[in-house]
C-alpha cells in the first residue's frame, strides 16, 4: 500500500494526463490524509478536473491535516478555492480562530460571511466587536447574534443603516427580554417588521402601553397578526 501511494504521488506530475488521473484516483482509494500536500500544486492546474479533485482532497482531509491546510485554500488567488477554504472554518472548531479573523478581511463577501459564522463559537468581546463593526451587512447581521456582544452595541445595531441588521438586532432584543422604550419600536412598526413579536413583548413587559401601540396599527399590519393567530 505504501508503495502504491508513493508511486501515485510521483505520477501526479506526469506529462500523460491519463497517468495523472489514475494517480489521483489511487490516492483517493487509499484514503490517507498524509498525501494531502501532494494535491497542493493541483490547485493551480490549468485543467479544471485536477483543481476539482484537489478541492475534494482538501474537503476530505483538510480538517484532519489542520489549520495550515485550510490556510492554503484561504490564501489562494482563486476565489472558488478560497470559498472552499471558508467552508472548512467552522469544522476547524477552536483551531479556526486566527484563520477566521483573517478571512474577515478577504475581498469576497461570501468568504467574509462564512468566517463570521465560524467566529460565533468564540465568546470573546473583541471578536464580537470585529463582527458588528464590519462593512459587510451579512457579517454585521451575524455579529448581532454573538453572545459576547455588549448590550450597548446591540442597542446601537437597532439603528444600523441596513434593515437586515436592524431586524436581527430587534429579534435578539425581544428574545432576551431587554428593556426598551416604546419609541424604539416605532420605526419597526412603520416598516412592518417583527410586528407580532413586538406586540407580544409589549403585552408582557409594558401592558399599559399596548393600547397606544395597537392604535398605531394599520391594515397592512393585520395580515402578520392574523397569520400568527
Language-model-detected regions and their locations in the chain:
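Short inter-helical turns and helix N-cap capping residues of alpha-solenoid HEAT/ARM repeat scaffolds
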Residues: 15-16, 46-48, 77-78, 107-108, ...
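Structural detector for internal amphipathic alpha-helices that build alpha-solenoid repeat scaffolds
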Residues: 1-2, 18-32, 37, 41, ...
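N-terminal leader/linker segments that initiate helical-solenoid repeat arrays
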Residues: 1-12, 17
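Short basic coil micro-motifs at the edges of alpha-helical modules that engage polyanionic partners
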Residues: 9-12, 74, 158, 214
Amino acid at each position: 500500500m505504501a508503495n502504491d501511494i508513493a508511486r501515485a504521488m510521483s505520477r501526479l506530475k506526469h506529462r500523460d494526463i491519463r497517468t495523472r488521473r489514475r494517480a489521483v484516483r489511487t490516492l483517493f482509494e487509499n484514503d490517507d490524509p498524509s498525501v494531502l500536500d501532494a494535491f497542493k500544486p493541483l490547485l493551480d492546474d490549468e485543467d479544471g478536473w485536477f483543481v476539482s479533485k484537489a478541492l475534494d482532497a482538501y474537503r476530505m482531509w483538510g480538517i484532519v491535516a489542520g489549520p495550515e491546510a485550510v490556510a492554503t485554500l484561504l490564501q489562494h488567488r482563486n476565489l472558488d478555492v478560497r470559498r472552499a477554504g471558508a467552508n472548512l472554518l467552522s469544522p476547524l472548531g477552536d483551531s479556526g480562530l486566527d484563520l477566521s479573523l483573517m478571512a474577515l478581511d478577504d475581498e469576497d463577501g461570501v468568504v467574509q460571511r462564512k468566517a463570521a459564522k465560524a467566529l460565533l463559537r468564540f465568546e470573546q468581546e473583541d471578536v464580537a466587536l470585529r463582527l458588528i463593526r464590519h462593512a459587510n451587512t451579512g457579517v454585521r447581521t451575524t455579529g448581532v447574534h454573538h453572545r459576547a456582544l455588549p448590550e450597548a452595541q446591540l442597542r446601537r445595531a437597532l439603528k444600523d443603516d441596513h434593515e437586515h441588521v436592524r431586524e436581527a438586532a430587534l429579534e435578539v432584543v425581544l428574545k432576551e427580554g431587554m428593556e426598551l422604550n416604546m419609541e424604539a419600536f416605532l420605526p419597526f412598526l412603520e416598516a412592518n417588521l417583527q410586528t407580532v413579536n413586538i406586540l407580544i413583548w409589549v403585552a408582557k413587559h409594558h401592558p399599559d402601553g399596548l393600547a397606544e401601540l395597537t392604535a398605531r396599527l394599520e391594515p397592512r399590519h393585520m395580515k402578520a397578526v392574523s397569520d400568527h393567530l
